[in-house]
Regions:
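Bacterial Sec-dependent N-terminal signal peptides
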Residues: 1-17
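Short, conserved micro-motifs composed of acidic
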Residues: 14-311
């Protein structure tokens, strides 16, 4: 049933045409001088959800935009299920009927708690249900971040469990007999003794994109890596996606469901570390209010061309 639904959705026209070279995504409207991260595009390409985050992670909320006639997009709005607690990292199921995200909202009342994985479900009229905590064994007393769900129902996410391989790891809870199994850390082809986090798994679980920090081939701030899964279901040693990475943090990858577009978040900037001569207040204000001012932005690129360069 899921496969049929996904095939139908991918047959629909995709009007977003990704650039061959890495570029800011919708500069000035999605990527601005604020902190934007965590792109999630619906399977049919008609909706986008992403996170708007305050400085120093003081608050985060999920924004929503939908496609209008003429290949235009609506103005951003706070998603109907967000805006009260720290919400971030939206991720669609492959059938578009569920949207997972991470939140510190309480199970009841108004007192914030640790971060858990939550989900909203699509009603027949297109509206979203009230958020539901995914529950154990996915959620624990620790933090769970950055959900990514496969066609099988398997749920991948990030946490810092003591049972892990390193300081922060990528886990999977398999979906079996209508429920999740206990979380298992991916093996050392993906996880290491360092930090691995914010993974996107393809719907067929044939590849996984994630960020790692501190590896010998790291550009300095945390890099994007890719691991392929062989026919036996074994993850292969991850490779640094050096053509994308920068000295800043590059993370939060997402590939559109037709596998044409790669989105990710980066804090790279155009600000100089020195000036040839003393600058002015006006020049500083202009620079600090620019899009590439060191705030996080969403970037995009043609994923198929990128895959070809990785072979």
């Amino acid at each position: 049933m899921l496969v049929m639904s996904l095939s139908t959705m991918l047959a629909q026209s995709q009007t977003l045409q990704p650039p061959a070279q890495l570029s800011l995504f919708m500069e000035g409207t999605v990527s601005t001088n604020l902190n934007e991260r965590d792109m999630a595009l619906s399977p049919d390409g008609s909706e986008m959800y992403y996170t708007l985050e305050a400085a120093q992670n003081a608050f985060s909320t999920i924004l929503y935009r939908h496609k209008l006639p003429g290949n235009k997009w609506s103005a951003p709005e706070v998603a109907p299920f967000s805006g009260q607690f720290k919400d971030l990292e939206p991720a669609f199921s492959a059938d578009g009927r569920r949207l997972f995200f991470s939140s510190n909202r309480p199970l009841s009342g108004t007192q914030a708690k640790d971060f858990d994985i939550w989900v909203v479900e699509r009603a027949k009229d297109g509206s979203w249900s009230s958020p539901r905590n995914v529950g154990a064994p996915v959620n624990t007393k620790a933090n769970e971040f950055y959900p990514s769900v496969a066609l099988s129902g398997n749920l991948y996410f990030t946490s810092e469990y003591e049972k892990g391989v390193g300081k922060e790891d990528i886990y999977v809870c398999q979906w079996q007999d209508g429920k999740y199994t206990e979380s298992v850390a991916l093996d050392t082809a993906v996880n290491s003794k360092l930090w691995e986090f914010n993974a996107f798994v393809s719907p067929d679980e044939k590849f996984i994109l994630f960020t790692s920090y501190g590896r010998k081939d790291d550009h300095g701030g945390g890099d994007l890596y890719i691991s392929l899964r062989d026919a036996a279901g074994v993850w292969q040693p991850a490779k640094n996606m050096s053509m994308l990475n920068s000295p800043r943090l590059d993370y939060c990858p997402f590939v559109s469901f037709d596998q044409k577009i790669l989105f990710f978040t980066s804090g790279r900037h155009d600000l100089p570390s020195t000036y040839e001569k003393p600058t002015t207040h006006a020049a500083l204000v202009k620079a600090y209010n620019s899009v590439r001012n060191g705030s996080e932005n969403i970037y995009w690129i043609d994923f198929q061309a990128l895959v070809g360069s990785l072979k």
